[in-house]
Amino acid sequence: SGLYIYPSFIDVHTSFGIQTPKRNAGSGRSAQYQASRDGYYWNDHILSDYNGIEDYSYNKKEAEQLRKVGFGVVNTHRANGIHRGTSVLVALGDPLPDSDRLINTKAAEHFSFKKSLTSNQSYPSSVMGSMALVRQFYHDLSWYKAGNAKNKDLAIEAAISNQNLPKIFDADDKLNTLRAVKIGKEMNLNF
């Protein structure tokens, strides 16, 4: 009694309630080769360990705008990096507490060919380099899973624990979509 069911759309690719980080102030990209974070992947544009729930905050005003155009659920992630980490699936119900709004706190893994705004690493400097980095990451992941690594890599371990999640690739255009599909086939990933 007093409850209603409304049909609605699901936006599977949004940054609802998650702020895009600001570009680092100061110098431009450098020939930095080591990760700026100890214990993580050597390239700072691989952020597979990031979980969208870490920075998520419900935005009533934005939720109202989305509901007005027919959306009731969003899959939200941080648009930052080549491997962007995981997203959060959120119901857009204002009177609900977050515990009821959060449908899944690890809904999917997100990817793009764009570098992280928070890193000054210069590599990769092209789409081809981004493609090579994704390939290298998944080759390294296979090598790591086989027990060949002496040190822990938290970014690779996060990707291993999230390997069964759906994969969403922000390709930006049709040629990059074809490139993402090609990488997916090569690395046995379903984008």
Predicted segment positions?
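Phosphate/adenylate-binding glycine loop and adjacent helical scaffold
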Residues: 58
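Residue-level marker of alpha-helix boundaries and capping positions
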Residues: 53-54, 171
